[in-house]
């Protein structure tokens, strides 16, 4: 067990966390910032990448890595951070030191809503709206802001997220059988499996992964967590969740639509 306190910088998620963004790149958790360098793609051995090694080495040796600024800021304000919450997660067998023990999957951006709190990397419908109206201004989609000088950069980004949403014939990473082979080969080590999106209930691969985990027997040692907008009812997916070690449904507020 890796014990985290306010007096150290250790983090279990730097060792056992695997959060895969909608674009297929990996990081230890959903809170971390990109920082310098390139995050490893799911197809790489993430734990051997320089990006991940430097993060792990810093946190293990008392250095507050700037990529973890969200946790540092929360802790400075006296608020429980995800890092500190790792102690409880370990006690409840929801994460351990194995690199695939805590898995957070965003299998693309397919969604059935366009909530105002969301952006194109996480909602295929927003991505389509932007792609269909690229001559409009879309503030906040680029760090520099949406100005004419950056229009070409914006168009490139809009096209990328339009493709990610599945609106073209181009094969996306979450459709690659090799990814699911890798996930299944590590299933015995998974203790938490979390799905966000997009909207997980409209993503076919989410249903397929959960069904496989149940049929293979791995669901018995996995805590399942899903973040949903709650618009889809009477799904086999909800019944499948009952076969996992524990289940948690996080409902997003629709007042922000």
Tell me the role of every PLM-derived stretch:
Residues 1-89:
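Accessory C-terminal segments flanking Radical SAM cores
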Residues 27-33, 106-173:
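Canonical Radical SAM [4Fe-4S] cluster-binding loop centered on the CxxxCxxC motif
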Residues 77-102, 111-113, 134:
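Recognition helices and adjacent regulatory flanks at domain boundaries
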Residues 15-23, 95-121, 191-194:
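N-terminal pre-triad scaffold of radical SAM enzymes
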Residues 15, 29-31, 82-83, 115-119, ...:
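A short acidic (Asp/Glu
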């Amino acid at each position: 067990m890796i014990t985290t306190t306010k007096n150290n910088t250790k983090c279990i998620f730097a060792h056992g966390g695997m959060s895969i963004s909608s674009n297929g790149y990996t990081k230890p958790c959903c809170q971390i910032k990109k920082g310098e360098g390139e995050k490893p793609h799911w197809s790489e051995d993430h734990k051997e990448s320089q990006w991940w090694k430097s993060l792990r080495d810093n946190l293990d040796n008392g250095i507050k890595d700037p990529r973890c600024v969200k946790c540092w800021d929360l802790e400075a304000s006296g608020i429980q951070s995800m890092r500190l919450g790792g102690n409880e997660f370990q006690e409840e067998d929801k994460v351990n030191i194995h690199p695939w023990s805590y898995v957070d999957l965003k299998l693309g951006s397919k969604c059935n809503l366009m909530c105002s709190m969301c952006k194109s990397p996480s909602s295929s419908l927003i991505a389509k709206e932007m792609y269909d109206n690229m001559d409009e201004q879309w503030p906040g989609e680029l760090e520099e802001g949406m100005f004419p000088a950056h229009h070409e950069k914006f168009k490139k980004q809009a096209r990328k997220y339009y493709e990610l949403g599945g609106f073209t014939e181009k094969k996306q990473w979450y459709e690659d059988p090799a990814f699911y082979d890798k996930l299944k080969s590590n299933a015995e080590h998974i203790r938490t499996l979390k799905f966000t999106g997009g909207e997980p209930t409209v993503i076919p691969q989410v249903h397929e992964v959960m069904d496989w985990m149940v049929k293979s027997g791995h669901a018995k040692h996995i805590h399942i967590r899903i973040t949903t907008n709650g618009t889809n009812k009477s799904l086999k997916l909800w019944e499948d969740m009952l076969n996992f070690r524990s289940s948690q449904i996080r409902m997003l507020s629709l007042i922000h639509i």
